[in-house]
């Protein structure tokens, strides 16, 4: 087996984690991001279920504050954030209906948080204490007891590509959590602004 010296290991470490080594470097990488498009797979693990609930869809982000979070299956729906306005639409049969239910404020909170992440501002929300760990891992823990009853912690894994998130785990408690994995990521490709407006 070929011997790898300590200098080589240091160089490899800088190559793979350099952009995620500090909050400043993360924000600097995010400033170079004009758009991100990615497919995602979501698994919701509940203690009462033998198998996780699976769904998949697409994420589209355009700096600084436009976001489209679309579930394509099994239940089609889309969340849109366009210059501060947040809307949700659900598909029933062949038609789309805007959802103005009581759950929308919680979804707005999530969309705004994702918007911060896309801009590299992981430590910018006063509701969470942010900790940056080696290897590009970020751990967010609630500061207030009320929020901690809903979210125990959020763990994000940054990708090797600067400005990109590889996965997100949202823990409700030790036994129930939601896992998101991103793939087919395209950075700084042209995006039609109409994608952030819904035409039902």
Region annotations inferred by a language model:
Residues 122-200:
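Gly/Pro-enriched, hydrophobic low-complexity segments
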Residues 11-22:
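Bacterial Sec-dependent signal peptides at the C-terminal "C-region" and cleavage site
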Residues 1-8:
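Bacterial N-terminal signal peptides that target proteins for export
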Residues 58-110, 178:
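An acidic-aromatic
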Residues 54-56, 74-75, 82, 149-153, ...:
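Short, surface-exposed coil-to-beta transition loops
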